[in-house]
Regions:
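Bacterial Sec-dependent N-terminal signal peptides
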Residues: 1-22
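C-terminal/peripheral segments of proteins
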Residues: 17-506, 511-514, 527-728
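A cross-family structural signal marking well-folded subdomains
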Residues: 520, 525-526
Length: 728
């Protein structure tokens, strides 16, 4: 009998497949993956399979900026309070309201096998990096898990969830109503710079070669995305910008298609006021003639306090509309938004592998790209613009700009609009499409969609100065090349400055200019062409004038019951304010300039600077440290090439923090060609040659040529290695 048992065990073991260990999986991925770093440190990652390529991509990202990779996941998965303390508990709770860790794991388990492999490869790439680099000490996450990408399935900064107030979450879920500061949890910059992007798609009728072209110009925080090239033998060959920690190229191109995202004004989130009925220990809410039970989910969150790790337990609530995020009086409010992480990851990754507009359109039919528009161009000469993607159907008799009555079934979302119902521009006869986070109804001149054809909830963004700036440039353009499209995208005219200073000059005609210096400054402004440059004294005068106006409290915030638009604020300063008020505030700006710089005759480049001192997420700017003059300006002025800034703690100068970060201009033909720019450099390591090798190029608008095809990559190769090996 004993012999029979032994034989049975041997037979069972021999028939059971050996489960590959994590270490064995790492080694196999590394063997199948090659990383070639070019002369700017851009990683060109070659993998046998898509999973191998993802493994190498995440390994390379960790090499370049592990801190930001980890920080993005600490925030996304809801563990920020373990580092930042109790103030971040409600950012963590917000993440769990939409998906618990258990649900994230279930989503991973329910994903198609190919997506599971990519998620495992994501975790393997980061864990292998940590194993091979023990000198790197994570802040919190010592082992990455394959379910984590379910929390970070879309490439925007924060995505939609950032719009859910952590303060309101605290007020609802925490009986302690102290005035404790609450952190949003996002890597957010306090620079008041409009977040957004520019996307231009150019048809062959407007280009010298006859090929379609694409401008990829996201306006994001500096160093928020790296530049990568990721290739597999399974059809992946994508180049562009990747948000740290994600395994797909978010803004970029392959050999046949290119995609660029701009922020959308589509209404993709709604609030439903729930009428709560308590029956003993049971909490229900009214829905038509019935009472529905609220889902009650306990969650325990950890936070650090005085060097100790503590824990707090919350009872989370969800209705069929979404999680309860706050209360309006006695009504509990559910906040509904797109939350389909599996489908979102599928759309984000498969987007990078499409070969033509038909395939791209089919991918867009997944309809999970909720916070963005998409500008598109391809090698067939097609150009297109998709305004929004995830758009719930609604009963237009209700006003969804305000919370709606959740007890009325008629307010429920009625599924999603079909892709064909959404705003789309395809191959307009004018030969170009533009979107600068502005209205879709000026995207292609008279060939733009018509506002009256779409429900109001499909669009909300008004026209802005960037859109006003772009339209005549594109209309008048011809025989465009990569270089001339770069010049167009960096056109230095500022329509906002034109409007503001024209109003000041008009005031000087109607009201006496009292000081000698004001008279002299106004004479200088009379001859200005409203173009920004490092030598422009006029630009400095204009910025200080706007700063003085903004801090004066004179600009109205509301127009009726609506918040006044950016164009409306400029209209007030240039047209509606009295001439006397305009001149008085201009005098204040001159006095501020003299205090800060000793003279009002200060060139723009003396004031407007680029500085990168270290790899920290938040730069501690210092006027005494080296910096570069930058002849760009904020997108608030209508600058297409945006340079958003903030002051340091004790600085007189302003320093760039956002705007043009990764920029690409792409031409599609028999072969794809492109030039790119990355603010600063590829690496966050101050000792790396690629920490600041693009800084002066950034200031000088000197783009680099992209090495896309392997023969070109090899010509530019500086180091070649498998993950885990020493670079050669």
């Amino acid at each position: 009998m004993k012999k029979i048992c032994i034989l049975f065990i041997i037979a069972f073991v021999s028939c059971t497949p050996n489960k590959e260990t994590e270490q064995e999986r790492w080694e196999q991925h590394a063997k199948n993956t090659e990383i070639i770093r070019d002369d700017f440190g851009v990683p060109h990652v070659y993998g046998k399979t898509d999973a191998d390529a993802v493994f190498g991509l995440l390994y390379a990202q960790a090499e370049d900026d592990f801190n930001r990779v980890e920080q993005n996941y600490i925030w996304a998965i809801g563990r920020l309070a373990e580092i930042e303390g109790e103030k971040s508990l409600y950012s963590d709770l917000r993440a769990k309201l939409y998906m618990t860790e258990k649900e994230a794991k279930e989503n991973f388990d329910n994903s198609p096998e190919w997506l599971q492999k990519l998620c495992v490869a994501f975790a393997d790439g980061l864990n292998y990096y940590l194993a091979k680099n023990p000198q790197v000490k994570p802040s919190l996450i010592t082992h990455f898990e394959p379910w984590m990408p379910m929390y970070f399935s879309e490439g925007s900064i924060g995505g939609d969830i950032e719009r859910v107030s952590t303060r309101k979450i605290k007020d609802f879920y925490d009986a302690d109503t102290t005035k404790m500061a609450v952190s949003d949890g996002l890597i957010r910059l306090n620079d008041n710079e409009p977040r957004g992007s520019n996307g231009f798609a150019i048809a062959g009728s407007k280009t010298k070669s006859g090929n379609a072209m694409l401008l990829i110009n996201p306006h994001t925080s500096f160093f928020f995305r790296g530049e990568v090239h990721v290739v597999s033998e399974e059809g992946l060959n994508a180049y562009g910008a990747v948000t740290w920690g994600q395994f797909f190229v978010y803004q970029g191109f392959n050999s046949k298609t290119g995609w660029m995202h701009t922020s959308t004004g589509t209404d993709i989130m709604d609030e439903f006021e729930e009428t709560i009925v308590k029956e003993g220990s049971k909490t229900t809410y009214k829905y038509g003639e019935e009472l529905k039970a609220l889902d009650s989910i306990p969650v325990s969150l950890k936070y650090t306090s005085n060097g100790e790790l503590k824990e707090k337990t919350f009872m989370m609530y969800r209705s069929h509309h979404g999680p309860i995020t706050h209360a309006n009086g006695d009504k509990w409010v559910s906040t509904a938004m797109m939350w389909s992480p599996i489908k979102a990851l599928i759309q984000s990754f498969t987007r990078t592998k499409k070969s033509n507009q038909k395939e791209f359109h089919e991918m867009m039919d997944i309809r999970t790209n909720s916070s963005n528009n998409t500008v598109y161009a391809d090698a067939d000469g097609t150009i297109a613009y998709y305004h929004g993607n995830f758009i719930p159907k609604r009963d237009v008799s209700f006003d969804y700009t305000k919370p709606v009555d959740g007890s009325n079934p008629k307010t429920d979302w009625q599924g999603l609009h079909a892709l064909e119902d959404n705003i789309l521009v395809l191959n307009p006869p004018n030969g170009w499409i533009q979107n600068c986070n502005s209205t879709p109804f000026t995207s292609a001149l008279e060939f733009s969609p018509k506002k009256e054809d779409y429900p109001a909830y499909m669009h909300s963004f008004p026209e802005n100065f960037r859109g006003i700036h772009a339209i005549p440039l594109l209309t008048n353009a011809s025989d465009l090349t990569i270089d001339s499209l770069i010049d167009l995208a960096y056109d230095t005219y500022l329509p906002g400055a034109d409007l503001l200073i024209s109003g000041l000059l008009d005031a000087a005609k109607k009201s006496p200019v009292k000081s000698k210096e004001a008279k002299e400054a106004i004479e200088l402004l009379k001859n200005w062409d409203f173009r920004v440059s490092v030598n422009s004294i006029e630009m400095t005068l204009t910025q200080f004038y706007l700063n003085a106006y903004s801090s004066s409290g004179k600009i109205p915030r509301m127009e009726g019951n609506k918040r006044i638009s950016a164009l409306g604020r400029f209209d007030y300063m240039s047209k509606l304010a009295t001439p006397k008020e305009r001149l008085e505030i201009f005098q204040l700006s001159l006095e501020k300039l003299k205090v800060d710089f000793g003279s009002w005759k200060t060139p723009w480049g003396e004031f407007n600077r680029y500085q990168r001192n270290d790899g920290e997420i938040f730069q501690d700017f210092n006027d005494a440290k080296p910096s570069l003059a930058v002849g760009m300006a904020s997108s608030s002025w209508g600058a297409l090439a945006s340079f958003g800034t903030r002051f340091g703690k004790d600085t007189k100068r302003q320093y760039g923090t956002s705007g043009n970060s990764f920029v690409a201009v792409v031409e599609f033909g028999d072969k794809v060609t492109a030039k790119t720019m990355l603010a600063g450099g590829q690496s966050s390591d101050v000792n790396s040659p690629h920490f600041s090798d693009q800084s002066q190029r950034y200031a000088d608008k000197q783009f680099k040529e992209v090495a896309y095809y392997r023969e070109d990559v090899l010509k530019r190769a500086k180091t070649t290695y498998h993950p885990g090996e020493e670079k050669k």
